[in-house]
Amino acid sequence: MATVLFVKANNRPAEQAVSVKLYEAFLANYKEANPNDTVVELDLYKEELPYVGVDMINGTFKVGKGFDLTEEEAKAVAVADKYLNQFLEADKVVFGFPLWNLTIPAVLHTYIDYLNRAGKTFKYTPEGPVGLIGDKKIALLNARGGVYSEGPAAEVEMAVKYVASMMGFFGATNMETVVIEGHNQFPDKAEEIIAAGLEEAAKVASKF
């Protein structure tokens, strides 16, 4: 039995959002293939996720050094710790997110900021930072209306690149990625593109 954390970063309904369709398809197929696993769903738009600021930065630094925290710092660290510990305790983590304005939704960026903790997800060494979550399985589920996997737009895709880079920085070595793209760029092929992506999601989910 494994504990699997599903992180959803889009609050649009499925009929309006291909990334939500992708997320829901992966979730349903995973549950069907792994009925005994513990599945935890985290909808970031239903959470209170304050931006990282002075209290959280100073608080997490003080925690690492064993210093006393102010009341405000302690509250900020407690918020980050809640999500960090949940992430660390999961055997597998699935991220479902769109590409908006070339990058990820702000709630997902903030959530990943909470995970970025020296001594927890990575450590400093004389040779540079080393990730600490190498045995955790990660799946990235992304949808984008245009084509960003190749051509001139590839350089400006900062959604999958960012999340994959952060998970790599944390030491993840077992990552799966499912992307649906081009359904807005090629509306006459949209149904075919989306159907193929959902089929791929089902295959990956059944083996994840």
UniProtKB/Swiss-Prot annotation:
Annotated keywords: Flavoprotein, FMN, NAD, Oxidoreductase
Assigned EC number: 1.6.5.-, 1.7.1.17
Reaction catalysed by this enzyme: 2 a quinone + NADH + H(+) = 2 a 1,4-benzosemiquinone + NAD(+); N,N-dimethyl-1,4-phenylenediamine + anthranilate + 2 NAD(+) = 2-(4-dimethylaminophenyl)diazenylbenzoate + 2 NADH + 2 H(+)
Domain of life, source organism: Bacteria
Required cofactor names: FMN
Gene3D superfamilies the record matches: 3.40.50.360
Note on cofactor: Binds 1 FMN per subunit.
Keyword Protein transport listed: no
Pfam family, one: Flavodoxin_2
Example of a GO MF term: FMN binding
Quaternary context: Homodimer.
Reported function: Quinone reductase that provides resistance to thiol-specific stress caused by electrophilic quinones. Also exhibits azoreductase activity. Catalyzes the reductive cleavage of the azo bond in aromatic azo compounds to the corresponding amines.
Family the UniProt entry places it in: Belongs to the azoreductase type 1 family.
Name of the protein in its database record: FMN-dependent NADH:quinone oxidoreductase 3
Gene name tied to this protein: azoR3
